[in-house]
A protein has these predicted regions:
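Bacterial N-terminal signal peptides
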Residues: 3-15
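Short, structured secondary-structure elements
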Residues: 19-267
């Protein structure tokens, strides 16, 4: 299934519907470093681009942040919480040249990291504990997908693997039962989110669910909308109505609900 999905997605980014003129679909190009007046301020190549914009505004770059500021930024960015007084004092008294790197490694190894940054992906995946519409019934296993996302971040799972598991985790080979279960839980990406479960037309309910799944997949993995092509060739993004139903046919092979009737239950 995943191979067919990828093949179909390749058709979406084609030379039709103005794709050649849209900046988002243009090939990535190497850029020369801009010339700056105070190059000694830079440490990385990206700094040249930042500094160039600063100098365009006749401004001056800020001074390097203090260690106290750095540790607060690191904790708030990676854990979402400020450091304790003891943690601040320990970092300030650490004179080792790699103290900053050690701090970052420590924060990344904490389960708080996955809880903090997994939330961003859960927003992309439209996560909720209920379906969020009409009857607003509870999704009894949604929490398993939430924990899967948090665990994936904490394990530093490769992003390509993260994508595959959420689209076709049940079809992947597994070394043991634990891995099989983890991969299958990744499919929660397709089952969570708003779904009209009180629809009295089973066929329409199923097709509406597929439309919602495809729209979310397009936004999450392609940075583009797909839903408009359900009724007509997309007016902006490079996807035709033919492409839409070619991809929808693949999703028709999946089973999201135990039964497609009022009120439906999750599979």
């Amino acid at each position: 299934m995943f191979g067919r999905i990828i093949s179909c997605l390749g058709l979406l980014i084609g030379p039709h519907l103005g794709a050649e003129t849209e900046w988002a679909y243009a090939p990535v190009e190497n850029s020369e470093l801009p010339k700056v007046d105070t190059a000694d301020w830079t440490r990385e190549e990206m700094d040249f681009f930042v500094l160039a914009e600063i100098e365009k505004r006749d401004d001056l770059p800020t001074k390097p942040a203090t260690k106290r500021t750095l540790i607060r930024r690191a904790y708030l960015d990676l854990h979402g919480l400020p450091p304790s007084t003891g943690q601040i004092e320990a970092f300030l008294s650490d004179e080792r040249p790699d103290a900053w790197g050690r701090l970052i490694d420590e924060l990344l190894q904490s389960p708080r990291y996955g809880e903090r940054w997994g939330r961003h992906w859960l927003d992309v995946a439209r996560y909720a504990d209920t379906n969020g519409m009409d009857e607003d019934i509870a999704h009894p296993s949604a929490w398993r997908y939430r924990d899967y996302v948090i665990s994936s971040f904490n394990k530093d799972k490769p992003f390509d693997r993260f994508i595959v598991e959420q689209l076709a985790g049940d079809l992947l080979p597994a070394k043991d039962l634990a891995q099989k279960r983890e991969q299958t839980v990744g499919l929660g990406f397709l089952s969570v989110g708003p779904k009209m479960l009180a629809c009295d037309d089973p066929d329409k309910m199923r097709r509406d669910i597929i439309d919602e799944q495809m729209d979310t997949m397009g936004r999450a993995f392609l940075g583009m909308t797909i839903g408009c092509a359900r009724c007509h060739d997309h007016k902006i993004d490079p996807i035709s109505i033919k492409d839409y139903y070619g991809l929808a046919g693949i999703f028709m092979s999946t089973k999201t609900l135990t039964k497609y009737s009022v009120v439906a239950e999750f599979h």
